[in-house]
């Protein structure tokens, strides 16, 4: 074993959930409902699961396309062939957010059909694109799609309600397997709750299999994030109490991120802490700071000390 640090099994089960192993195979093209066709982006991997899901929505010749994958030749070949074979034209191309695995296919799509240049929609549009606003409606035969602003995973993230199916295109906010990541955890939690309030039964995620029980999946996501907050706040509160016992009342104490990780997960390789855990745990700490439940001492984010401002039961 040498000087190697032991791996924490519970951490790896969480971190690798839905990543590369034991994922169900998804067809390259599939009719997932009578009005929704899923076309995979051809970009499978640890961050993209089976690849980016792009969706053709509608029942007539005119359809809505949601997302354009990463820009790999496999995707433009699949979708262009499908459009030609089924005599379909695109009325709207809706982008859930700016990340490259969702917008990368736009140039290929326009190169294939220059008439689509003015049919690209995004919340924070690039030059020549159209904006998407909260509540905006996009309609074609057989499909009414309503945009819902859901920031957090990214600043411009949109979900889309398919009214005819009471279904939600969840983008990257909720995945078919495992958990997503957030740029702004506070906004992300608000968006998850707003998505839950829509009461859609079915989820069409941007990565992974269809979510048959979307309310249950949203509850799982919310509880997972809230559980992490409670766990970290409890760890810091315990340190606060023990620090006051050791050094007297009024002592803030505090733990570095490494010390928090060791307390919660046990000892892990430093590379794992910095590359896998630190980004998400720092987001939790920042949210707790914004909620005025945690404070910190100035310094490097990985080395500064964090301390509880209030106690928990």
UniProtKB/Swiss-Prot annotation:
Residues annotated as binding Zn(2+) 2: 101-102
UniProt enzyme class: hydrolase
Enzyme Commission (EC) number: 3.1.-.-
Sample GO molecular function, one term: metal ion binding
Cofactor binding: number and manner: Binds 2 Zn(2+) ions per subunit.
Protein's UniProt keywords contain Metal-binding: yes
Record: residues binding Zn(2+) 1: 97, 99
Cofactor(s), names only, from the UniProt record: Zn(2+)
Biological-process GO terms, alphabetical: secondary metabolite biosynthetic process
Pathway the protein takes part in: Secondary metabolite biosynthesis
Entries under SUPFAM superfamilies matching the protein: Metallo-hydrolase/oxidoreductase
The entry's keywords: Hydrolase, Metal-binding, Zinc
Protein purpose: Lactamase-like protein; part of the gene cluster that mediates the biosynthesis of neosartoricin B, a prenylated anthracenone that probably exhibits T-cell antiproliferative activity, suggestive of a physiological role as an immunosuppressive agent. The non-reducing polyketide synthase nscA probably synthesizes and cyclizes the decaketide backbone. The hydrolase nscB then mediates the product release through hydrolysis followed by spontaneous decarboxylation. The prenyltransferase nscD catalyzes the addition of the dimethylallyl group to the aromatic C5.
Family as reported in the entry's similarity comment: Belongs to the metallo-beta-lactamase superfamily.
Protein name, entry field: Lactamase-like protein nscB
Organism: Arthroderma gypseum (strain ATCC MYA-4604 / CBS 118893) (Microsporum gypseum)
